[in-house]
Amino acid sequence: MILELDCGNSLIKWRVIDGGGGRSVAGGLADSDEALVEQLSLRRGLPVRACRLVSVRSEQETSQLIARLERLFPVSVLVAAPGRQLAGVRNGYLDYQRLGLDRWLALVAGHHLAQKACLVIDLGTAVTSDLVAANGTHLGGYICPGMSLMRSQLRTHTRRIRYDDTEARRAMGSLHPGQATAEAVERGCLLMLRGFVREQYAMACELLGADCEIFLTGGDAELVRDELARARIIPDLVFVGLALACPIE
């Protein structure tokens, strides 16, 4: 079995897959290294024979996590690294090492699955959008704040915006003009997110052609599903790219 980890800005997503068929047998989300170790300790009975990860954290933070993983399981950890090219996709950044690794793996995975031009939108803490031509040329992309970041910035920098998570969840039941602060903020942020997604789709159709494949991934992908009815939602898209970057026999 193979342990896979996606170490993002806010959360660590992990799963254990059957090395043969790639079927997920366990998985979870952790908000800290300690929480991750606690979750994985409960699965020490699984015969994990290999581990691979992608991290957008600092080298020091990543190294510390790797050391903890190697103490927990008898494995050497493979770590995804930046590249100019992978699986037929050419990195479109002028400085290829500056493209976030999770973003790179997601767009590589999108092209690998589509085998044609594609738009990949990852809706997490930040929202990223990347366009890949049919020949594997990464045209570049965009980054904007995600729902949680927009919400937290308004709460932090606007004194009179105060509400709890329960109010936030209730507010998301409609897009009718808000009649309370939570409704106004939550619905306003969601409309901004949906507007960004619509604009990305229009640009993809212009640059890549109307038949391009659309992929949505990330924790907030379901919030914009209605905007792109033909999009494919693939929660583990980064893990698909990770397998291409760090193949294990």
From Swiss-Prot:
InterPro entries: ATPase_NBD, Type_III_PanK. Signal peptide: none annotated. It catalyses: (R)-pantothenate + ATP = (R)-4'-phosphopantothenate + ADP + H(+). Substrate binds at residues 93, 100-103, 181. ATP binds at residues 6-13, 125. Pfam families: Pan_kinase. Pathway: Cofactor biosynthesis; coenzyme A biosynthesis; CoA from (R)-pantothenate: step 1/5. Keywords: ATP-binding, Coenzyme A biosynthesis, Cytoplasm, Kinase, Metal-binding, Nucleotide-binding, Potassium, Transferase. A monovalent cation. Ammonium or potassium. The active site is at 102 (proton acceptor). It is an enzyme of class 2 (transferase). HAMAP family: Pantothen_kinase_3. Homodimer. This is Type III pantothenate kinase. The lineage of its organism: Bacteria, Pseudomonadati, Pseudomonadota, Gammaproteobacteria, Pseudomonadales. The gene is coaX.
